[in-house]
Amino acid sequence: MSRNAAFSPPPDARAYRLSTARGEFAVIDSPVADGVAARGTVLMLPGFTGSKEDFTLLQAPLGERGYRTVAVDGRGQYESDGPEHDEAVYARPELARDVLAQVAALGTRVHLVGHSLGGQIARAAVLLDHAPFDSLTLVSSGPARISESQRLRVKLLRDALDTMTMAEVWQVMQAMGPPEEAGAPAPGHGREEPERLRERWLGTRPAQLLATGSQLCTEPDRVAELAALELPYHVLSGAYDDTWPVPLLDEMAVRLGARRTVIEDAEHSPNTDRPQPTAHALADFWDGLRRGGSGRPGL
């Protein structure tokens, strides 16, 4: 989760429910800035316990660079519908098919961006069908399961959800401070909007958290499968990350032949920790593809 999520959408952005063949999904759709030539469309997938608002601070700067951005709540996240207790609908292949349905509903090819859990869902969608995508950017999202320390914290969250209400779990996380992948505002953290973050937490379906939490703890390494596809890749992260250590992300980028960006003074959520340099790095990558680059180092 991004703890500095911004709940006020950019000027001219529209919040609506995107109708797809697999149901409706809540989105924030931010256009290209006035007077700027359109360069492409971006679909953005949030992480565990996150939401579309985790990308709000990127949307205006990307619009100024010519990119329409559509940030989406996945099935069972915040303002998108999903069952409370049926974990089967949140299986990784099902979430990947949701992404393909979202792209089809947008009616255009997209640059796909996934933060953390969203990156692994994005990867699964690309492996199902990479044809609708112009590129894939993995933001603080690693090759396989999360680190041991984060697995322990996610297990604690899953255990709590078995015995406590969502409201009770929120109170515990506020008191203790969250793991990077089990979202609540850290005590004394000044930039978040606590009531909106609580509202987001309460809107997320418990079954979605249980299913995706398990996925984070068991995800296999699928980098070789991804590298076999003809698609430009970008691995972007902060300078520190306990969920997937930065050297592991460096290695993954090499295995993918991906562009690699490290955002200084950012941690697990560069999209909210340092949105301006993150937006610039994203747009620079996509602009390079428009100029005929492969997105891969040395090519």
Go through each PLM region and give its residues.
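Conserved alpha/beta-hydrolase "nucleophile elbow" surrounding the catalytic nucleophile
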Residues: 46-48, 114-119, 238
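Conserved alpha/beta-hydrolase catalytic His-Asp/Glu region
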Residues: 147-152, 165-228
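Conserved loop-alpha-helix segment in the C-terminal half of the alpha/beta-hydrolase fold
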Residues: 230-266, 272, 277
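Active-site loop/oxyanion-hole signature of alpha/beta-hydrolase fold enzymes
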Residues: 10, 20-21, 64, 71-113, ...
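Alpha/beta-hydrolase fold catalytic core
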Residues: 1-42, 64-67, 107, 134, ...
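Flexible "cap/lid" loop of the alpha/beta hydrolase fold
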Residues: 123, 127-128, 133-164
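Conserved HGGG/HGGXW glycine-rich cap/lid loop of the alpha/beta-hydrolase fold
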Residues: 26-82
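Short beta-to-alpha linker loops that shape the active-site pocket of alpha/beta-hydrolase fold enzymes
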Residues: 73-78, 142, 266-267
